[in-house]
């Protein structure tokens, strides 16, 4: 199979808050081959205690993955736990990790924060 078809592309968006404030999500673009690890980071707006991760597969609606209240998991009903993991540690960016990427993981991953 051609490398083009086995390439996993993960695009990240920035979530906007109030003017001058925004969620910092890194990296902005991430390309991985099948079976490789992918890790994304999200620094919420200062003072926000809730963090949300979403996934949008091409031409589909955003799918909720997981949310945190401070460093505690608040809701993980959408998280595919076999290969995906997420955490929020105090005074550190939150992270979303895919252990062994698959083609169907190609998506936009979006992080948002709220008070």
From Swiss-Prot:
Localization of this protein: Cell membrane
Disulfide topology: 42-111
Origin superkingdom: Eukaryota
SUPFAM superfamilies in UniProt: Immunoglobulin
Domain Ig-like: from-to ranges: 21-115
Signal sequence, renumbered to the chain: 1-20
UniProt keyword Nucleotide-binding, yes or no: no
UniProt keyword terms in alphabetical order: Adaptive immunity, Cell membrane, Disulfide bond, Immunity, Immunoglobulin domain, Membrane, Receptor, Signal, T cell receptor
GO biological process: adaptive immune response; cell surface receptor signaling pathway
This protein's GO CC annotations: plasma membrane; T cell receptor complex
Function: V region of the variable domain of T cell receptor (TR) beta chain that participates in the antigen recognition. Alpha-beta T cell receptors are antigen specific receptors which are essential to the immune response and are present on the cell surface of T lymphocytes. Recognize peptide-major histocompatibility (MH) (pMH) complexes that are displayed by antigen presenting cells (APC), a prerequisite for efficient T cell adaptive immunity against pathogens.
Subunit-structure text: Alpha-beta TR is a heterodimer composed of an alpha and beta chain; disulfide-linked. The alpha-beta TR is associated with the transmembrane signaling CD3 coreceptor proteins to form the TR-CD3 (TcR or TCR). The assembly of alpha-beta TR heterodimers with CD3 occurs in the endoplasmic reticulum where a single alpha-beta TR heterodimer associates with one CD3D-CD3E heterodimer, one CD3G-CD3E heterodimer and one CD247 homodimer forming a stable octameric structure. CD3D-CD3E and CD3G-CD3E heterodimers preferentially associate with TR alpha and TR beta chains, respectively.
Protein name according to UniProt: T cell receptor beta variable 16
Gene: TRBV16
């Amino acid at each position: 199979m051609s490398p083009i078809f086995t390439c996993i592309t993960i695009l990240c968006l920035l979530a906007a808050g109030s003017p001058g404030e925004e969620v910092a999500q890194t990296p902005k673009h991430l390309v991985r081959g099948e079976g490789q690890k992918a890790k994304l980071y999200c620094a919420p707006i200062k003072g926000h205690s809730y963090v949300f991760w979403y996934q949008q597969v091409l031409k589909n609606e955003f799918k909720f993955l997981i949310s945190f209240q401070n460093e505690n998991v608040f809701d993980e009903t959408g998280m595919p736990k076999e290969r995906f993991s997420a955490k929020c540690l105090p005074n550190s960016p939150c992270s979303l990790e895919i252990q062994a990427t698959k083609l169907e993981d190609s998506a936009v991953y979006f992080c948002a924060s709220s008070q």
